[in-house]
C-alpha cells in the first residue's frame, strides 16, 4: 500500500506541473511576447530603431539589444514630455496675449461653456514629433479664429436675454400696470360714448304714433286709453328696461324714470296635485319677467296641493301667461286652455286660478 500511495503522489505532482506549464505557455512563447512588447514600445519613442531584430538573438535570450530598446524609449518619452510642456507654455502665452488684446471679450468666455466641446482644440494631447506639434499649432490658430464669432454670438445672446428680463421686470412694476389700467378705462369710456350716441339715434327713430299698451286677442280685452305723451314715456321706459338687462352695468344712462315704470307684486296661485316628487308647477308668459315663453318661473309648494309665488311686473301693463307642469327640468304639460291675460294696474294683487279653467 505504501508503494501505491507514493506512485499516486508522484503522478499527481507530474500532472500538476504539466498543467501549470500549459497555463503559462512554453519557453518559446516568452520570447515572442518580449518581441511584441518591444515592437509596441518602438512607435512611442518616435522613429523605429534599425537593427533592433538583426542582432541575431533568438527568442529564448533577448541579449543586450533588448536592453537598448528599453532604455531608448524612456529617453524619448522624457524628450516628448519636454515637448509637451513647451506646447502647454505656448498655449498659455497665446491665451494671455489674446486676453490683453481683447479685454472686452472676457465676458464672452462664459458663453463658450455652452458650445459643444468638439469645436475647441485639445492642446493637452501629447505630441510625438515636431511635425505633429506644428499641425497642432495650426489647428489652435484655426479654432481660435472660429471661437471669435462664437464669442460674439454668445455676447449678443446675453444682451437679448438681459433685454427680455428688463421687459418682464417692467411688466411686473405697479406703474406699468397703472398705465395699462388707465388705457383700458379710456377705451371703455370711448366705447360707452359711441354706444350712447347710437342709442340716442335709435330712440329718435321710434315712431311717435305707436302705442305700447295695445295688447289683446280679437278685441276681447283692451288696454286702457293712453294719451300720446304717456305712450311715448311707456315706450321709452320699456325700451330702456329691456336694453338695460341685456347690457351689463349700463343703467346709468337712463336720466329720468317716468312715473309709469313702477312695479307691482303679483302673486300667482294654483291648485294641482303632482304624481311624483320631481314634478312641480311653474308659470311662463310673453313678458321678460315671465320668461318670454322660453323659460319658466317655478312656484313654491305650500300645502294641500297649492302652489304659489310672487313676481314683480311693471304697472299698467297687460301680460299673457299660463301655468305649466315641469319634470326633470323640462315642461311636460301645459294648461289645457287658451292663454291667460293679466292687467297689472297700480296695486299688488293675487291671481288665483284653477288648472285648465278660466
Swiss-Prot record:
Region Disordered: start-end pairs: 30-70, 104-151
Polar residues: bias regions: 126-140
Biased composition (Low complexity): 50-66
Effect annotated for changing residue 293 to G/L: Abolishes GYS2- and glycogen-binding, and leads to rapid degradation
Protein modification: Ubiquitinated, which leads to proteasomal degradation.
Modified residue annotations for Phosphoserine: 65, 117, 148, 175, 188, 194, 210-211, 220
Keyword Cell membrane assigned: yes
Biological processes, Gene Ontology terms: glycogen catabolic process; glycophagy; intracellular transport; substrate localization to autophagosome
Impact after mutating residue 203 to A: Abolishes interaction with GABARAPL1
Basic and acidic residues: bias regions: 30-42, 106-115
Chain's role: Acts as a cargo receptor for glycogen. Delivers its cargo to an autophagic pathway called glycophagy, resulting in the transport of glycogen to lysosomes.
Name used for this protein in its record: Starch-binding domain-containing protein 1
Organism encoding this protein: Homo sapiens
This protein's encoding gene: STBD1
